[in-house]
């Protein structure tokens, strides 16, 4: 009898957890900011967001310039949020302070940057667990490299995922941001 009770408890717990994850959106998260404080995604309600995992020593690092351009051009309706991560080839080895200095000095980054996180593996940040979860079936799966982009709509829902090779100024991304 105890085994049956335990199995039922586990089943209902897992079912509730799955339902909660499915109903989540970006407004359920906040993250530590690169230069201290917190990035609360509730502050961006009503705007689209482009969430990007970044790195300072990657072949795609020049996308910082395009991301900054995008933020300046569309900042009234779009927020770019960068997430430095050292998951791919050790291409983000710096401290938060070093990353902030690099971004400002080389690209004039003014969009919000989160503190360094892990975007995959056992220590994957909760936000990236949600972004890559099976509930987001069209976008599921591990991040493959730096500068993958996740488009969030004005209601906080994940609506598209773009791989590293997609320029932030790619026509498909710009069109999705303008819709």
Model regions: which residues?
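Short, internal strand/loop/helix patches
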Residues: 97-146
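Bacterial Sec-dependent N-terminal signal peptides
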Residues: 1-24
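N-terminal "domain-start" segment that seeds a small globular fold
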Residues: 19-42, 126
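Structural recognition of the beta-strand scaffold that forms the well-ordered cores
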Residues: 49-52, 79-82, 112-115, 151, ...
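Conserved helix-turn-beta segment immediately C-terminal to the redox Cys motif
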Residues: 47-48, 57, 61-86, 103-107
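Thiol-based oxidoreductase modules, predominantly thioredoxin-like and allied folds used
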Residues: 77-95, 110-121
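Thiol-/selenol-based redox modules, centered on thioredoxin-like
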Residues: 126-129, 133-179
């Amino acid at each position: 009898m105890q085994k049956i009770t335990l199995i039922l408890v586990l089943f209902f717990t897992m079912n509730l957890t799955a339902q909660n994850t499915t109903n989540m959106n970006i407004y359920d998260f906040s993250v530590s900011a690169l230069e201290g404080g917190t990035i609360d995604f509730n502050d961006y309600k009503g705007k689209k967001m482009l969430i990007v995992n970044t790195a300072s020593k990657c072949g795609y690092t020049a996308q910082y310039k395009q991301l900054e351009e995008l933020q300046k051009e569309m900042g009234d309706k779009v927020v770019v949020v960068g997430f430095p991560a050292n998951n791919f080839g050790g291409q983000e080895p710096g401290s938060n302070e070093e990353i902030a200095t690099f971004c400002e000095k080389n690209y004039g980054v003014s969009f919000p940057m989160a503190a360094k996180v892990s975007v995959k593996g056992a220590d994957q940040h909760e936000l990236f667990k949600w972004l890559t979860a099976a509930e987001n079936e069209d976008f599921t799966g591990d991040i493959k490299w730096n500068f993958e982009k996740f488009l969030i709509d004005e209601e906080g829902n994940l609506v598209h995922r773009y791989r590293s090779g997609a320029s932030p100024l790619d026509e498909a991304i710009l069109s999705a941001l303008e819709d």
